[in-house]
């Protein structure tokens, strides 16, 4: 299924049904008193989340979604049927914005929300009967429904986000620590869409990790795949900053680390005025040196020292391919998440 994380649509609640003009028909009397019923209520627009979908691709199939209008009232004081509600099912973490970019509703911790109310049904002529007018010949029209244009923006919900250069081993890592099976190959930009994986850290403990397409220097200006997927890790508690420690592609691990952090800062600067934005550059990071199976002991010791000086904390060293230190890494990750939850 194609991954779609932004879509613009219009939503409309149903119009209320009109009231009915009707008079009783009785034997011996051609026209009895008024008995026109009220119109039915228009359907609401209800937003409901589902954890079983993770893309807006199905919603993109239509430009306009409308609830059903209420039916007209009938004689014998029968009310018209209410219009059927429109239930729009979206992934958890979907944000609804108006066309000015303001947040209308954030479906992060909410399972259901009535976004637009349907119009009220009009009163039938029986309602307007009084001592002065015993046979009113008018009824009320139904109330108009509401309509709005919205932009849906999906931000995946995960506890941990993995950031790093292409080929740092992000997809290999998430497949090693979870049941996720992203595409893995030895060339840049293998990952073209975000991947989510559930990591078990004990009998009763688990957390969700998000792997996004790799960043490169200049991503904020559109280089590579750009920074379009960074919004999917805005909700995470912390980052795994994964670094290719091998240097086999002619890269400098420390430069890669610095470049990624600079891209996060640029992303923050470009989005700081956006309502509902969560800065990324200040998010806690667990720096992880990957592919240590390609290094000698002395090379690894030297690299860890350099990273400790640069980041202010001891980096974690693993090999996602061989599984070296993976168990200890997952335990440390679980501890870090627990620490963030307590704070």
Swiss-Prot record:
Annotated GO MF terms: GTP binding; GTPase activity; magnesium ion binding
Name assigned to this protein: GTPase Obg
Gene: obg
Chain sites annotated for binding GTP: 164-171, 189-193, 211-214, 290-293, 319-321
Subcellular location: Cytoplasm
Function as written in the Swiss-Prot or TrEMBL entry: An essential GTPase which binds GTP, GDP and possibly (p)ppGpp with moderate affinity, with high nucleotide exchange rates and a fairly low GTP hydrolysis rate. Plays a role in control of the cell cycle, stress response, ribosome biogenesis and in those bacteria that undergo differentiation, in morphogenesis control.
One Pfam family hit: MMR_HSR1
GO biological-process terms attached to the record: ribosome biogenesis
Record-listed E.C. numbers: 3.6.5.-
Subunit architecture: Monomer.
Species whose genome carries this gene: Bdellovibrio bacteriovorus (strain ATCC 15356 / DSM 50701 / NCIMB 9529 / HD100)
GO cellular-component term (any): cytoplasm
Family from the record: Belongs to the TRAFAC class OBG-HflX-like GTPase superfamily. OBG GTPase family.
